[in-house]
């Protein structure tokens, strides 16, 4: 197995799904967390001048979905054929689009105080409209897979983890009832976060502001 080193801020943000994939697979990695001051030094060392970044035996890979997809294949948490892999990529693109949408894309910066706004009001006025646009799409994919709490097949894939982490932040940082209208997404979150390996990690994970 390669030596993995993962670079991201000391928050969940866009990096937590990557950490969860390592814990799901029970694979060791160096979890390099840092603040803004240290980031000023590290930035020039990153391929695109941004994080998350995964270093694999000295080779750095950037972009959340590229890293998650690689780990999905590395840990046998991807599709078993080309069509299934393409379907997972399709769903991942929807999740990534949601995370980069006008409201959700700014919400972490609001939580961290980088954008001055009332958190509750911003969530209601800017994030919930994004949820109403994208959550029904993911809900449909989950229902089409047989209502087993997964997006494809009967075993957690990298996209299940990516989606569960992305949507769970709506409840953890936004509103407890943010996903009440989407029972299949709630079932996905419940299934992923109750996997023994992930459950153990989350039980020991420190709270972060975003």
UniProtKB/Swiss-Prot annotation:
Any GO molecular function: glutathione peroxidase activity
EC number: 2.5.1.18
Keywords, alphabetical: Transferase
Binding-site residues, glutathione: 8, 39, 43, 49-51, 63-64
Purpose: Conjugation of reduced glutathione to a wide number of exogenous and endogenous hydrophobic electrophiles.
Protein name: Probable glutathione S-transferase gst-36
Residue ranges constituting the GST N-terminal domain according to the UniProt record: 2-79
Keyword flag Cytoplasm: no
Catalyses which reaction(s): RX + glutathione = an S-substituted glutathione + a halide anion + H(+)
Alphabetical list of CDD domains matching this protein: GST_C_Sigma_like, GST_N_Sigma_like
Biological process (GO), any one: glutathione metabolic process
SUPFAM superfamilies according to UniProt: GST C-terminal domain-like, Thioredoxin-like
Record PROSITE patterns: GST_CTER, GST_NTER
Presence of keyword Mitochondrion: no
Family per record: Belongs to the GST superfamily. Sigma family.
Record-annotated GST C-terminal domain positions: 81-210
């Amino acid at each position: 197995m390669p030596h993995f080193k993962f670079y991201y801020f000391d928050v969940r943000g866009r990096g937590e799904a990557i950490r969860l994939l390592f814990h799901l697979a029970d694979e060791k990695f160096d979890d390099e967390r840092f603040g803004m001051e240290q980031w000023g030094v590290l930035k020039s060392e990153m391929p695109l001048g941004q994080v998350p970044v995964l270093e694999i035996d000295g080779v750095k890979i950037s972009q959340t979905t590229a890293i998650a997809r690689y780990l999905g294949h590395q840990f046998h948490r991807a599709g078993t054929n080309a069509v299934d892999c393409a379907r997972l990529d399709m769903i991942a693109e929807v999740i990534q689009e949601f995370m980069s949408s006008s409201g959700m894309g700014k919400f972490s910066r609001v939580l961290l105080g980088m954008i001055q706004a009332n958190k509750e009001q911003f969530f209601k006025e800017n994030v919930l409209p994004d949820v109403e646009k994208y959550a029904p799409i993911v809900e449909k994919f989950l229902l089409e897979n047989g209502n087993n709490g997964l997006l494809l097949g009967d075993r957690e894939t990298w996209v299940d983890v990516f989606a569960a982490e992305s949507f769970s932040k709506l409840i953890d940082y936004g509103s407890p009832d943010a996903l009440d209208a989407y029972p299949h997404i709630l079932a996905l979150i419940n299934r992923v976060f109750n996997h023994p390996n992930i459950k153990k990690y989350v039980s020991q994970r420190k709270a972060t502001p975003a």
